[in-house]
Amino acid sequence: MQLLFKNAYVVDVHSPYHLQTVDILVEGSQITSIGDLPEMDCPSVDLEGATLTTGFAELHSDLGEPGNEECETLETGAAAAASGGFTAVGVVSNGTPGIDNKTGIEFILSKGESTAINLVPVGS
């Protein structure tokens, strides 16, 4: 499936399109073309007035799991982070037990495999 993003203001210091307004064609999960693209026979989104950037990383996030899942789970925290533009979150457990051994680290990593972002365990 193709999707055309029109008028995307790019903020990415590593991109040759940094601080430029361009059109971006995505096919599947890959960016296939960037520039001043013609109208195409595919769905399009006009991003005029919006900014397109790389994903953000949160280095310290107190999630409830493990230990306080009634407050927040890794899945709900990851979903909230993804909706805010974050692609990686450093997970600090504010529950008991903390992340202080190999099993705790493996738990975070395995739960993270089913989320849309990278969950990175931060040990205590």
Model-derived features: positions:
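N-terminal metal-binding scaffold of metallo-dependent hydrolase/deaminase domains
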Residues: 1-39
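A generic structural signal for short coil/turn motifs at secondary-structure boundaries
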Residues: 14, 65-67, 97-99
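Short, low-complexity, polar/charged sequence segments that are solvent-exposed and flexible
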Residues: 24-29, 64, 75-78, 108-110
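Conserved active-site and cofactor/substrate-binding residues in soluble primary-metabolism enzymes
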Residues: 26, 69-72, 76, 99-103
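Residues at the C-termini of beta-strands that transition into short coil/loop
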Residues: 35, 48, 123
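Divalent-metal coordination cores built from histidine and acidic residues
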Residues: 78-124
